[in-house]
């Protein structure tokens, strides 16, 4: 008898560094790339959070909202295509990873 894989429900976080007139198109491409990755994996995308070309402060605010959803067990984790686009530096990346792990979630980078 085959064992069923547990589905991990995640939010996809879309973030690109580009001129404002190209942001939506590039975020759509990033979403397609993430969906292609999770198609044959145990992850399921249950929500999407877009940066929309906002500043780093807005990214941090959105990140805290995602961490709160993980803490409340509404989702199991977050999927990002490129961690370097949502962080200022390496220390900020470690802090964001630690926040998600402390909340009991996972981060998947594609």
Residue ranges and their predicted role:
Residues 1-110:
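Short, structured surface patches at the beginning of a domain
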């Amino acid at each position: 008898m085959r064992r069923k894989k547990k589905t991990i429900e995640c939010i996809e976080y879309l973030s690109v560094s580009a001129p404002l007139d190209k942001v939506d198109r590039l975020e759509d491409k990033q979403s397609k790339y993430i969906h292609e990755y999770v198609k044959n994996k145990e992850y399921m995308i249950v929500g999407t959070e877009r940066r929309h070309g906002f500043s780093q402060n807005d990214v941090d605010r959105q990140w805290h909202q995602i961490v709160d959803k993980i803490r409340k067990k509404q989702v199991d984790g977050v999927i990002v295509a490129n961690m370097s686009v949502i962080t200022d530096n390496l220390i900020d990346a470690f802090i964001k990873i630690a926040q998600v792990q402390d909340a009991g979630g996972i981060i998947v980078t594609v």
